[in-house]
């Protein structure tokens, strides 16, 4: 999937599609554990689960000018105040700036990756966060999403992370974000295996819309942006 001129592997940024002159970028962040100091591997299930998202996002983007990459974590866990995946995400953004310049970037994160994406949203390159079944404990900071777009999809039947806590975070973020939307995926689970095609297609369409709002339709209905009950799709 990687284009010509791609750098060798290693480091926090792993390019999957690398145009010669990117105008924008998408970084994908997989899930992990609350605590875990063992090394993160690309063959761990949390990382493997995001591969269909890589393919779906790539299929919906113009390869000639949008860079697609994943963030490589050093460790498997969040690890308390260390917030190791946030450090890795910020390092990936630093490397991205070296590679492509200060291009507008969308972060797509699942579970722990959604938490890392939220925390890294204040980076000057980040324009939007797409959080999938995010792990957002009560009281997560939202000041850093000021001026950014926030899209959240959470499985209606998720028993690992809390749709209610995601909804509470989105409500607080609406006071500072450019726009904030949330939808529940009907019958959806944390691993995003039930209705997997819907997860993949809706995520890819949301990313395409965030990068080209005038040219690509928003896959989410207007109710997702309102203050009422979170709609079920």
Spell out what each predicted region is.
Residues 2-63:
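Short, surface-exposed "cap/lid" segments of acyl-processing enzymes
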Residues 4, 178-233:
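C-terminal catalytic histidine-bearing segment of alpha/beta-hydrolase fold enzymes
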Residues 41, 162-172:
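Short alpha-helix in the alpha/beta-hydrolase fold that links the catalytic acid
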Residues 79-99:
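Alpha/beta-hydrolase active-site loop
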Residues 108-113, 117:
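Gly/Ala-rich beta-loop-alpha elbow adjacent to hydrolase catalytic centers
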Residues 145-146, 151-158:
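Short beta-strand/loop motif that positions the catalytic acidic residue
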Residues 156-162, 191:
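Acidic catalytic loop of the alpha/beta-hydrolase fold
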